[in-house]
């Protein structure tokens, strides 16, 4: 009796070209979706920043106008965020306070990112002595409790816009500086960098010509991710009373003043400013993470 003919079982790995094409197509779709999400977030964030800054400029006077005939009004059509104990429009105060926080966040994040970029490049390219000094300084700053160092800098510089910007900027650069330093050390091991160095080019030339262009994606992602942290820490330090003065309606000031009225049922005084602050932080943090996934080669397959 003849045995029935058997055929080899089909396996997915029998057609590697087909599997590779399917995986590549799926990756492209996933990457395109992430790119679209990032572009949409970038447009929304840019429009939000512009609208808040313009609105804060026009709400400068309205945020300080008092009217006791309308004090402690809950949210309504005339006053979407309600009014406070002095009859001030909470919508105008929230927009004005958020614009102040955004301006501080942009200035502090930019200053901190530039400082981290310069120190990271200097540490990795200017010899062992410079590397040891910068690394020691990074470890020193990271060894001090974050909020304590921020409070000390703000108090030393005086309460106000200048002190808060310097305090936030000087306490947020260390992680990005370490990242930049690590990227530069990896680039130094590349063959083309060693070839250029053997041709007699200086460290400054190599850094500016061949390293800086490769570091721009990390710098952009670091800058975007520093922005929500700067806003959050500015609001925290102002909430604790070490930041801006009470004459400036920053989000931290608004939340600090609203705490004593929560027990009386005036929930809107803290709810809407807090929601606006959280939405701003989450929006830019999400955008930064999507940018990192698009621009960072190490996370290309995540």
Stretches found by the model and what they are:
Residues 26-32, 64-108, 253-274:
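Periplasmic/extracellular loop-to-transmembrane helix junction in inner-membrane transport proteins
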Residues 55-58, 104-138, 151:
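Transmembrane-helix boundary motif in ABC transporter permease subunits
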Residues 80, 84, 90, 124-125, ...:
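Generic hydrophobic transmembrane alpha-helix motif, especially the helices
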Residues 88-103, 127-135, 185-189, 194-221:
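Amphipathic cytosolic juxtamembrane alpha-helices at the membrane-cytosol interface
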Residues 155-156, 183-184, 225, 232-276:
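Glycine-rich helix-loop "coupling/hinge" segments at transmembrane-helix boundaries
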Residues 171, 217, 224-225, 267-302:
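C-terminal transmembrane helix and the adjacent membrane-cytosol boundary/short C-terminal tail
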């Amino acid at each position: 009796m003849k045995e029935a003919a058997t055929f080899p079982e089909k396996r997915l790995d029998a057609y590697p070209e087909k599997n590779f094409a399917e995986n590549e197509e799926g990756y492209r779709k996933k990457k395109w979706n992430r790119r679209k999400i990032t572009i949409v977030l970038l447009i929304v964030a840019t429009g939000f920043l512009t609208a808040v800054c313009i609105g804060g400029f026009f709400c400068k006077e309205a945020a300080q106008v008092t009217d006791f005939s309308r004090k402690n009004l809950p949210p309504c059509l005339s006053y979407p965020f309600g009014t406070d104990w002095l009859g001030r429009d909470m919508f105008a105060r929230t927009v004005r306070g958020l614009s102040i926080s955004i301006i501080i966040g942009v200035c502090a994040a930019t200053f901190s990112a530039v400082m981290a970029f310069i120190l990271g490049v200097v540490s990795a390219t200017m010899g062992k002595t410079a590397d040891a000094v910068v690394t020691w300084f990074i470890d020193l700053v990271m060894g001090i409790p974050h909020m304590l160092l921020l409070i000390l800098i703000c108090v030393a510089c005086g309460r106000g816009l200048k002190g808060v910007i310097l305090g936030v900027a000087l306490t947020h650069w260390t992680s990005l500086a370490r990242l930049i330093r690590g990227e530069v050390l990896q680039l130094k091991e590349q063959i083309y960098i060693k070839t250029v160095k053997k041709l007699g080019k200086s460290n400054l030339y190599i850094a500016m010509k061949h390293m800086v262009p490769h570091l721009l994606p990390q710098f952009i992602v670091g800058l975007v991710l520093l922005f929500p942290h700067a806003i959050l820490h500015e609001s925290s330090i102002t909430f604790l009373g070490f930041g801006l003065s009470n004459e400036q309606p920053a989000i931290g000031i608004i939340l600090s003043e609203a705490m004593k009225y929560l027990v009386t049922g005036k929930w809107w005084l803290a709810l809407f400013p807090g929601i606006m602050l959280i939405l701003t932080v989450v929006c830019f943090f999400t955008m930064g993470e999507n940018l990192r996934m698009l621009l960072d080669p190490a996370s290309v397959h995540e």
